[in-house]
Amino acid sequence: MRKIFFDTEFTGLHQNTTLVSIGLVSDEGERFYAELTDYDDTQCDDWITKNVLDHLLLSGNTELEKELEEDELTTRVIGNRDDVRTELLNWLDGFGDDIQFVSDVCHYDMVLLCELIADGAMLLPDYINPFCHDLCQDISMILDISEKAAFDISREQFLTD
């Protein structure tokens, strides 16, 4: 089974949120990074603008642009939802027949990933496990704290403690 770690950025914590970007890293180091051009920017508050949108390639992030240009392991896509879906499925097809996704706080990220790939979990390709391994629950168990406390803890703090 191949593990693929991923994170998404989206327009807010609400029911009709739209995907802004997605990054994935396989357990062997292959990477995929995409920014979507057709997200609903009317859903973005000041926090999303400052902490997400302002750091995108689409916003002129030259530091990220340079980093990605020098990185031969990253597949980079900028496009609409259909473009990103096509390229992501092509990338995932290269991993064989059994993929397990891993994320921090899966209940946000996995829904958006499933919608991107297949318009929902029930339509995922057979080689993709529809269940996501949640790192937040691991943090909760390792530190013997509630999942709420694990959700609130800084990931940088967790890595250094």
Feature locations, PLM:
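Metal-dependent phosphoesterase core characteristic of DEDDh/y 3'-5' exonuclease domains
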Residues: R2, L19, S26-E70, R76-D161
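Short acidic, Gly/Ser-rich segments with clustered Asp/Glu that frequently serve as metal-coordination loops
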Residues: T8-N16, I22-G23
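Short, hydrophobic/glycine-enriched beta-strand segments
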Residues: K3-D7
